[in-house]
Every structure is written in C-alpha cells, then in structure tokens.
From Swiss-Prot:
Binds 1 [4Fe-4S] cluster per subunit. The cluster is coordinated with 3 cysteines and an exchangeable S-adenosyl-L-methionine. The keyword Iron applies. It comes from Chromobacterium violaceum (strain ATCC 12472 / DSM 30191 / JCM 1249 / CCUG 213 / NBRC 12614 / NCIMB 9131 / NCTC 9757 / MK). Its EC number is 4.1.99.17. The lineage of its organism: Bacteria, Pseudomonadati, Pseudomonadota, Betaproteobacteria, Neisseriales. This is Phosphomethylpyrimidine synthase. GO terms for biological process: thiamine biosynthetic process; thiamine diphosphate biosynthetic process.
Length: 632
C-alpha cells in the first residue's frame, strides 16, 4: 500500500482496446475545439435470405475518453490533455495561483519522502478572481451558453439525426420505421425534448434542474450533464482502504470503470496517501471525479471524529478543489436534533460521513459545523466550480428503516441548503437512499422533487431487499431502474461486494454493467427520445442470426461472446440459425423464419400460411391412414 508508484506504470492493455467492431468518432460543434466523443458500432448486412439490406452503424454514449481511441497517445505518467483549458482561460474570470493555497497540500508537496508517490504536475492551480464566480450555473443564469453546455447538448443527442438521415438516404422506409419505433413512455413530469439544444441545457442549469460537474482545475474532463431531463447517468465508486489497494490499482479501476460506462467516478479512499492517489486519478480521468472530503479530514485527526474542526475541513476542501475534484459529498443535513431520531432504527446510521458528523455533534453537543458554515463552503465551491452532492448521512441501511423520520427530516434540510447554494450560483445535486422496498421508492422521488425544488437526485440503488449478500448489485439495480424511471438523474452503482469487502476490477465491471442496464431501462420507461434504437438494432440482429452484431451491440460484448462460445465455439456457429439453448429444431426465431419463407412461396400472409400449413398436414395425416402412432 505504501510502495512507491512504478514510474513505468501503464494503463491496462485491456482498457485501451476499442470494443469489438467499434470505433471512436468525434462530432464537431460550432468551433473546431468542440469535439464530442461517441462510439460507433458497425453492423453486418442482413443475410440475403432475410432481405439482404444494409444495417447502418449505431451510435452510443462513450465515457472512455481517449483510452479507446487508437490514435491517442496514452501516458499515465503525463496524464490526459487539458481539453477545457482554453475555454476556461478565455472566460477571463479566474487566475493562476503562484502555488497551492492549502496548508496540507503545501506540506505534502514539500515532503521529500513522498517524491516517489507524487504525480509531477507542472501547471499551477486556478481560482476565481476576487469578486468573480466561475460556476456553470452562474454563466447559465446570465444567459451565457458555454462550450461545456454545447458539448453536452451534442453528446446527449447521440448523433441521432445523422443515423436517421443515413436510413432515409438508403431509401428503405420499412427499415426507418422499424429502427425508430419507440413505445410511449411515462415521464412523471420530466420534459424530454426530441432534440437537446445548447439553449435547453443552459435553461436547465440556470433553473437548478441539471448540473455540469466541471472544476476549473480538472480541464482533462469531457463535459457531461446530470439531470432528469437528460439520459440517466451512473457513478462508479473506487478508492483504497486502510487494509488494501494501491495508487496503480485505483487508477486501473478508474480506467476500467469508464471503459464500461461510468459517467462519473467517486474516489472514496480512506487509507494512506489519499492526496497522491486522488492526484493520479484526476490527471488521468476524462470523467468528473467526486469525493467525500470528511473522509480525508478524519485521517488528518487520526480517525478521531471529535477532533475534527471547521478549520481542518476548510483546508481539506481547498486542497481537493485545487487538485480538481468536480463534486463534493457534504453531509450538512445531519443536524444535532436528528441524531436521536435514529436511536430506534434497526441499523442506526450506516453512512460513514453521517456517522462521523453525528459523533462530532454528540461529542460537542453542538450543531453540525458543516451546517453552520454552509455559506462559507459555498464561497469555496463557487471559486473553483465544485458542485455540491448533498449527502444523505441519515439514509436507511435496511428496509426496516426506510422513509423514517430521520431520513425525511434530513431530506427537508437538504432542500433548504439547496436554496442557499443557489443564491451563490453553486450547482447542487441531492443524494438519496439506500435500502427501500419497492412500494416506498416513489415517495422518495416525489418528496425530493418537492422539497429540493427539482435539483438532480443521485441515489445509491436503492436496495429493494436485504436478503442477498453477494448479490446486492442485483437487489439494488431493481430499485435503481425504478427510481431512475421516476426521475433520479444519476444512479450510484452497488457491487456484489457491498457490505462484504472492497471491490476489485471484476466487481467494478459487473457493477457498472448492471447499472448501465438499470439506467437504460429507466430511459426506455421515461420515453427518452431515441433510447430504443439500440434495442431495436439488437433485436433485428438476433432475429437475423447475426451473432457478432448481437454481441457487439450489447453492454458487454466479451461476456456475450464467451457465453455463446462455451457450447458453440466454432466459427461456423457464428452464422448458424440457432444457439445451444434450443438447438437447430426448436429455435422459435428459426421457425418464424420458416413460416415467413413458406408464406412468401405461397404468396400469402403469415396467418394464412399457418392455416395452409395445418391443412396440408391434415391431408397428409389422413392419407397416411389416420394412425395416431406409427410403429418403429
């Protein structure tokens, strides 16, 4: 854990390979330096016996940054290129500092024993000029459409217009109707325009219904948006602990997580060298990075919650903001008066941050200093454009505790704090539970929308049952899909190691894929424009026995291919009209194809073909003597 960073450290080769039959494309915005990444999945033509038509490429959201671009030069030691640096500088409202202003940051920088662990960043941190505000919300409320806003507008549309135009150009009206058909959704009041414009993005951010987490000290990040009127996003958690993991392992987890679709990453490190670990992650991350600053503050006082102070916490906020953290989980809603409400719970306070602040409140019998200093925190946030993720420190840790007085009291307070943050033009999202049975989930969403004025909701699951240790990625994905449908903007993944141990790379991938599935199911249920195109493409490939396209259009092509090849490994099986589930004689899709071919040969429709076929078999039965069984 304390070993020096390997100066030859490189990203895992598996994380930088393009996904099968995919390539990175960039859609240019109104200026040459707005290059929005997407993944293009190429498809095979439909076989001649099924119509012999061209299947144009499908475009999907891509969070992998330059790692999956063969043209990019990946060097973990140097970090990623500062994509947004020019945009930030051109606004003229921030300044480069002579050095770090955090006392702790300066101490780490000056410690020669840390030289082998340190990322050698050459540039100095930036901060807003005196009296200025550098948040995306501040710009939005002044009618300014930033490059970041245009970037996310293009990104959210997923090149859908180009896809539809390619279908129209082919002159195949049937294919156009087939691929763009989508069931009507139930959006529960969300506003889902057919096409996202930069102006729509600006309006949503100005109203507080969406955020773009984009610290001015994290110029490597590719802008993304979190809000219920946009695609549902997912977060992946990584981080070391006091007993396991290293810097290189955490960077590996980050690059692995974004390959499979993590829209943001939270570094929840609680072990040694938190500062250095975070620096390596930030400099190599194309997605926003979130943290829980109270974890590091606690390490600074040797794990004694009662020794925490506003001064230590403030220095930690500045330290992390100057490194480039894009959003902070702040447990300012854990008020002294709410702590006794948890006494009769089944599982008490399960949030680490919540329990830390509850212990501090009780030790001093004083109000939570995060609450009393909230406006001071806002001053720091707006100087760097760090977004609030207002923590649910009193979230239920069991179904028994769901939607209780403590949880809902804190949620009301988070709504009050949201309004204070908005007075400073600081971006806010609200964290949510937790462990909640399905019938109580909608109440959480409804109250959040009402009490928190439609600020984006960011939920951990929720886990819908407590009976499945080792399978909590599934128990939580059930609740995640449901609450995403109701309006949650971002889902925090849960891995199968939840409640059991620190996740490894395999667990990270399983958690990400599971939550991508939940988020997509929510987009479909809401009726998000274009959400069904990928489903339609995969279903068409499945019906036409285009096995490679089935694999490649899925969320995890590798697993799909491996499962297929366990029983049918030969290349010839990739063009077979069956799989090992039903075999060649009982494949429902093959039977349907046979019916269609018979109908075409008879010049009739499918229903008529079935009737004709039955009549022919009846005549054959009578001619054969009408015997129920033949002797063998």
């Amino acid at each position: 854990m304390n070993a020096p960073v390997n100066k030859q450290m490189v990203v895992d080769a598996a994380a930088i390979q393009p996904l099968p039959n995919s390539r990175k494309i960039y859609v240019e915005g109104s200026r040459p330096d707005i290059q929005v990444p997407m993944r293009e999945i190429r498809q095979a033509d439909t076989p001649t016996q099924f119509g012999g038509e061209k299947n144009p490429p499908i475009f999907v959201y891509d969070t992998s940054g330059p790692y999956s671009d063969p043209a990019a030069r990946i060097d973990i030691q140097s970090g990623l290129a500062p994509l947004r640096a020019a945009w930030i500088a051109q606004r003229g409202d921030c300044e480069q500092l002579p050095g770090l202003s955090s006392e702790y940051g300066r101490a780490r920088e000056a410690d020669p024993k840390l030289a082998e662990l340190r990322f050698n960043l050459q540039r100095k941190p930036r901060r807003a000029k005196a009296g200025r505000n550098v948040t995306q919300m501040h710009y939005a409320r002044r009618g300014i459409v930033t490059p970041e806003m245009e970037f996310v507008a293009i990104r959210e549309n997923l090149n859908r217009r180009a896809y539809v135009e390619s279908l129209q150009a082919a002159g195949n009206r049937r294919l156009l109707d087939l691929m763009t058909r989508q069931h009507q959704g139930q959006s529960f009041g969300a506003h889902l325009p057919e096409e996202i414009t930069p102006e729509f993005v600006r309006e949503e951010i100005a109203a507080g219904r969406a955020i773009i987490p984009a610290n001015i000290n994290h110029p490597e990040s590719e802008p993304m948006i979190i809000g219920r009127n946009f695609l549902v996003k997912i977060n992946g958690n990584i981080g070391n602990s006091a007993v396991t993991s290293s810097i290189s392992e955490e960077v590996d987890k980050m690059t692995w997580g974004i390959r499979w679709g993590a829209d943001t990453i939270m570094d929840l490190s609680t072990g040694k060298n938190i500062h250095e670990t975070r620096e390596w992650i930030l400099r190599n991350s194309p997605v926003p990075i979130g943290t829980v600053p109270i974890y590091q503050a606690l390490e600074k006082v040797n794990g004694k919650a009662e020794d925490l102070s506003w001064e230590i916490f403030r220095d930690t906020l500045i330290e992390q903001a100057e490194q480039g953290v894009d959003y902070f989980t702040i447990h300012a809603g854990v008020r002294l008066a709410y702590v006794p409400m948890t006494a009769n719970r089944m599982t008490g306070i399960v949030s680490r941050g919540g329990s830390i602040m509850a212990k501090w409140c009780l030790a001093h019998h004083r109000e939570n200093f995060l609450y009393t200093h909230f406006e001071d925190i806002c001053e720091i946030m707006k100087a760097y454009d760090v977004a609030f993720s207002l923590g649910d420190g009193l979230r239920p840790g069991s179904a028994w505790d769901a939607n209780d007085e403590a949880q809902l009291s804190e949620l009301k307070t988070l709504g009050e704090l949201t309004e204070i943050a908005w007075k400073h033009d600081v971006q806010v999202m609200i964290e949510g539970p937790g462990h909640v049975p399905m019938q109580l989930i909608k109440e959480n969403m409804d109250k959040e929308l009402e009490w928190c004025r439609e600020a984006p909701f960011y939920t951990l699951g929720p886990l819908t049952t407590d009976i499945a240790p080792g399978y909590d990625h599934i128990t939580s994905a059930i609740g995640a899909a449901q609450i995403g449908w109701y309006g949650t903007a971002m889902l925090c993944y849960v891995t199968q190691k939840e409640h059991l141990g620190l996740p490894n790379k395999h667990d990270v991938k399983e958690g990400i894929i599971t939550y991508k599935l939940a988020a997509h199911a929510a987009d479909l249920a809401k009726g998000h424009p274009g959400a069904q195109i990928r489903d339609n493409a995969l279903s068409k490939a499945r019906f036409e026995f285009r096995w490679e396209d089935q694999f490649n259009l899925g969320l995890d092509p590798d697993k799909a291919r491996d499962f297929h090849d366990e029983t049918l490994p030969k290349d010839s099986a990739k063009v077979a009209h069956f799989c090992s589930m039903c075999g060649p004689h009982f494949c429902s899709m093959k039977i349907t194809q046979d019916v269609r071919e018979y109908a075409a040969s008879q010049g009739v429709g499918e229903q008529d073909a079935l009737r004709l076929g039955m009549r022919e078999k009846a005549i054959e039965f009578v001619k054969g003597g009408g015997k129920l069984y033949d002797k063998v």
